[in-house]
């Protein structure tokens, strides 16, 4: 098998693992939001196990990337693909950690009702799932237009965050506490 063929096979395996990591992280985000909205303590607790698997994916993919860089010494486009994968796994792993943190929070929350419906939180979770999925899809398919759409979605996420923050400040002010 030629060196180029070996490289292409290793890159294909890298992309397959990256997609698997992404799909698991998407599910974790979905589960975290579902657990939060429904106050499902057991679902919240279960997310930690998936987070361990995402951590394993990160280590495995990082090793694969390093092996490719050291053995194949890619240049130009090939190097960018491997270095982009390294950056992506760090971000995807962080998303998994954050989903796990939400799960832990749900597990330890008291059983009181929410004072407000979590509609914007649900929208943020759905948007986060879409961003993770489309980020990896744009990388796998080398689709710059899709990557730019993900960047635009980040602005929507920022807007949702500001909306939630303002609503929380208003709720705190109504309660008589200092909302600033």
Q: What is the meaning of each model-derived region?
A:
Residues 1-180:
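Cytosolic, long alpha-helical scaffolding segments
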